[in-house]
Amino acid sequence: MEVLEMNACNIGKRLVELRGTKTQEEVAKAIGISTSALSMYERGSRVPRDNIKLRISSYYKEPISSIFFAQQKHET
């Protein structure tokens, strides 16, 4: 099984899904980033740097791999 980084659009969709009913302001403040940065990540116009990925993963209590990486099965 190969692990690949998801494209920015899929990462954005996953971040929106994780945020649920919380506001962007609430999540951004908790993570320590600007609301505009979180908005760009959620829209898929930017991918967070590794240190921000760690903060996001910690905040949502989700493994980095489940947020930012897709697993691709190879047929044999």
Model-identified regions with their sequence ranges:
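A short, Lys/Arg-rich alpha-helix, primarily the initiator
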Residues: M1-T21
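Short alpha-helical DNA-recognition segment
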Residues: T21-M40
